[in-house]
């Protein structure tokens, strides 16, 4: 492999603020923020919007979208007039 062309693969903390969930894993993502982890070491921090702790599919708190009501409303508004 060529030298100095591959991104650094290092430990990184991903933080989901909506669920107050942090996970230490490895990644090549670039970030300027850092955080002190439970082991006392400082790691790069990546803030994410959704994780397995906050996504409706994984939490079981899915919202059912009322598409039937939307379709009926669309047909009333734009449908053919008899």
Curated annotation (Swiss-Prot):
InterPro entries: Ribosomal_bL28/bL31-like_sf (IPR034704), Ribosomal_bL31 (IPR002150), Ribosomal_bL31_B (IPR027493), Ribosomal_bL31_sf (IPR042105). It comes from the Bacteria. One of its GO terms (molecular function) is structural constituent of ribosome. Disulfide bonds: none annotated. GO terms for biological process: translation. One of its GO terms (cellular component) is ribonucleoprotein complex. Keywords: Ribonucleoprotein, Ribosomal protein. The keyword Ribosomal protein applies. The keyword Transmembrane helix does not apply. It holds the Pfam family Ribosomal_L31. Belongs to the bacterial ribosomal protein bL31 family. Type B subfamily. Part of the 50S ribosomal subunit. PANTHER family: 50S RIBOSOMAL PROTEIN L31, CHLOROPLASTIC, LARGE RIBOSOMAL SUBUNIT PROTEIN BL31C. NCBIfam families: L31, PRK01678.1. This is Large ribosomal subunit protein bL31B. It comes from Dichelobacter nodosus (strain VCS1703A).
